[in-house]
Regions:
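A short helix-breaking turn/cap at a secondary-structure junction
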Residues: 1-48, 217-220
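Acyltransferase
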Residues: 44-69, 107-128
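Short glycine/proline- and acidic residue-enriched helix-loop micro-motifs
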Residues: 96-108
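Glycine-rich, small-residue loops and helix-cap segments
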Residues: 106-220
Length: 220
């Protein structure tokens, strides 16, 4: 779907009025380009596609950066996100003595950490408008019947790498409560490459708008 359709669908389905997009062009938009993550990896083809569309955005007037001292600790974010995700996914599973249930105190402790992380992200967005990252570290990979994510692996730049850590890319936005949009910006060996466009809390329409502009640049 195109960005206009995404924006319309959001307006039609949102239970509250969403703020309008802050950006109608890329001129002056402050974009943090994040091609590395301390908890996972991305193939060189993915990172090259990310840099290429970022360079085109800069030519259109965007202001690029590649780091910020205000960024939260992404390794800790991934650790706590995996904890919460595992708990959520196990709620309907049979009891497992190897993985005892978490207590209410510990769960609220995780919620406190999540809320603190969301505040840290908001401070980071004082200095940037948009963050772009890989969605996943590779293009589409061969199907596997292995049900255990921890036993799966990927080939990244010719070397075996763990599959399960790839959720660190999308986990940043999910755990931090930020809107993100996946958008195609290139291809490698005939397979599409997407990037993730992350915006501040409640700026869903801004994420959609910038994603659409980046997609148009990549297509051009």
């Amino acid at each position: 779907r195109c960005s206009d359709e995404r924006a319309l669908a959001l307006d039609l389905t949102s239970l509250i009025p969403m703020p309008r997009a802050r950006h109608s062009s890329l001129n002056g938009v402050r974009i943090l380009v994040m091609e590395d993550h301390p908890a996972t990896q991305a193939d060189s083809a993915i990172r090259a596609a990310l840099r290429a569309v970022a360079d085109k955005a800069a030519n259109a007037g965007a202001i690029l950066s590649t780091s910020s001292p205000a960024l939260p600790d992404r390794a800790l974010i991934h650790r706590d996100y995996v904890k919460m995700l595992s708990i959520a996914m196990s709620t309907r599973a049979p009891p497992d003595p190897a993985h005892p249930e978490i207590g209410v105190r510990d769960w609220f402790g995780l919620l406190d950490k999540q809320a603190d992380t969301a505040r840290q992200w908001q401070r980071a967005f004082d200095a940037v408008d948009i963050i772009i990252t890989p969605v996943f570290g590779t293009t589409a990979f061969a199907h596997t019947d292995e049900p255990d994510w921890h036993k799966r692996s990927l080939i990244i730049d010719g070397k075996e790498a763990p599959f399960v850590t790839q959720i660190a890319w999308i986990g940043m936005a999910t755990y931090g409560g930020m809107p993100s949009v996946s958008v195609p910006v290139g291809s490698h060996d005939g397979l599409p490459i997407g990037i993730q466009v992350i915006a501040p809390h409640w700026q869903d329409q801004s994420a959609i708008a910038v994603a659409g502009m980046l997609n148009a640049l990549a297509a051009g």
